[in-house]
């Protein structure tokens, strides 16, 4: 008889926390794909990021709860482009690609889909596959953040905004300073739906200070 795999204490604790989490239960009741929806809902209620008619790019979109919030808040009047290494099941009003944001063909898809149209809001909830080596994982995470920031600066409208998930610790201050150089206003948000024990916070940048030339990417 095959032996059942042992469940670690940390795995059991995570599972218990997950199934008893009020936001997990609420997401199931409200039809959202994950509890992360409430992070964006709370930030939007404070900062008024989403409006009908916008073009939104969601990086690290799977399973799609932020896309759901965006479509809902925009009343299906606008565009939502979603990218993730994992598949995003079809959602009305969302154009999704399963791909690696760091790969040239993924960026080419974005550029071709946008067709030189500027973006109102870039969302990034990206995180690397964790190796368990903290410094390495943090470095890889901020590499993704920097790529998302570069995309945002190049494609946002002058009054656009960039919301990115970051983790406080190594690399945080350097990235926040990069955000401050790129945007007129940068604030930190820690929504209630973020677990207290997590170092996760969100940086919100508004109004790019200087839109870099994007002639090479095909935008005008």
From Swiss-Prot:
Q: Which InterPro entries match?
A: RNA_methyltr_RlmE (IPR050082), RNA_MeTrfase_FtsJ_dom (IPR002877), rRNA-MeTfrase_E (IPR015507), SAM-dependent_MTases_sf (IPR029063)
Lineage top rank: taxon: Bacteria
SUPFAM superfamilies according to UniProt: S-adenosyl-L-methionine-dependent methyltransferases (SSF53335)
Which Enzyme Commission number(s) are listed?
2.1.1.166
| Presence of keyword Transmembrane | no
Cross-referenced HAMAP family, in alphabetical order?
RNA_methyltr_E (MF_01547)
The identity of this protein, by name, is Ribosomal RNA large subunit methyltransferase E
Reaction it catalyzes:
uridine(2552) in 23S rRNA + S-adenosyl-L-methionine = 2'-O-methyluridine(2552) in 23S rRNA + S-adenosyl-L-homocysteine + H(+)
Q: Which gene encodes it?
A: rlmE
Primary enzyme class? transferase
Question: What Gene3D superfamilies does the annotation carry?
Answer: Vaccinia Virus protein VP39
Q: Which organism is it from?
A: Thiobacillus denitrificans (strain ATCC 25259 / T1)
Q: Which GO terms describe its cellular component?
A: cytoplasm
Check the record and name the Pfam families matching this protein: FtsJ
> What GO annotations for molecular function exist for this entry?
rRNA (uridine-2'-O-)-methyltransferase activity
Which PANTHER family does the entry mention?
Answer: RIBOSOMAL RNA METHYLTRANSFERASE, RRNA METHYLTRANSFERASE 2, MITOCHONDRIAL
Report the locations given in the UniProt record.
Cytoplasm
What this chain does, per the entry, is described as: Specifically methylates the uridine in position 2552 of 23S rRNA at the 2'-O position of the ribose in the fully assembled 50S ribosomal subunit.
- What protein family does this chain belong to? Belongs to the class I-like SAM-binding methyltransferase superfamily. RNA methyltransferase RlmE family.
